[in-house]
C-alpha cells in the first residue's frame, strides 16, 4: 500500500469534484492518509474505537466516534467525499449507504483481491486499486 499514491488519488479526485469537506471512515490507528489530506481539505476522521479517536485528536485531527450500523448523520453535514482505507468487505455496504444518505462521493481503497460491491466502479491508479461512486447531482 503506497500512502503517497493513495493521497495523490484522493486529492486529485476531490479537487476534480470540488470537494471541500471530506471524511475518513474507519481510520483505526493508520493516520498517514488523513494527516496529509488535512493539509488541503476540511477533514474529519471517524472510528468506533475510542482509543483511535483519542490518538487521532492528539495528532491534530478532527476525530469523532461513530457507529456505521447506526450513524450520527449530523456528523456528516456538508461532507462532499467519504473515503475508507482497507475496510472489511462486510462494512463496505454500510459505507456506501452512508455516502448515499449524505449524498457524498465515495472512495474505497480495498484489501487486494476483493470483488467490488455493486454500484462501485473499479479504478486503477499508479498500481493502487480503488472503488468509487460519484454523488448524485
UniProtKB/Swiss-Prot annotation:
* InterPro entries found in the cross-reference section: SAM-dependent_MTases_sf, UPF0146
Name-wise, this protein is: UPF0146 protein MJ0688
Kindly give the Gene3D superfamilies that the UniProt entry links to this protein.
Vaccinia Virus protein VP39
User: What NCBIfam families does this protein's entry cite?
Assistant: PRK04148.1 (NF003165)
According to its UniProt entry, this protein's organism is Methanocaldococcus jannaschii (strain ATCC 43067 / DSM 2661 / JAL-1 / JCM 10045 / NBRC 100440) (Methanococcus jannaschii)
Q: List the disulfide bonds.
A: none
A Pfam family per the record: UPF0146
Q: Which family does the record claim for this protein?
A: Belongs to the UPF0146 family.
Taxon lineage = Archaea, Methanobacteriati, Methanobacteriota, Methanomada group, Methanococci
Question: Origin, by domain of life?
Answer: Archaea
Amino acid at each position: 500500500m503506497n500512502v503517497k499514491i493513495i493521497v495523490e488519488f484522493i486529492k486529485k479526485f476531490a479537487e476534480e469534484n470540488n470537494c471541500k469537506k471530506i471524511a475518513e471512515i474507519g481510520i483505526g490507528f493508520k493516520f498517514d492518509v488523513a494527516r496529509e489530506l488535512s493539509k488541503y481539505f476540511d477533514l474529519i476522521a471517524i472510528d468506533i474505537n475510542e482509543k483511535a479517536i483519542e490518538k487521532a485528536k492528539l495528532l491534530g485531527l478532527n476525530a469523532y466516534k461513530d457507529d456505521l450500523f447506526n450513524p450520527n448523520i449530523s456528523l456528516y453535514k456538508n461532507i462532499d467525499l467519504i473515503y475508507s482505507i482497507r475496510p472489511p468487505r462486510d462494512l463496505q455496504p454500510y459505507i456506501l449507504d452512508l455516502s448515499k444518505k449524505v449524498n457524498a462521493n465515495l472512495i474505497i481503497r480495498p484489501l487486494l483481491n476483493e470483488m467490488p460491491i455493486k454500484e462501485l466502479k473499479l479504478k486503477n491508479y499508479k498500481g493502487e486499486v480503488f472503488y468509487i461512486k460519484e454523488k448524485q447531482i
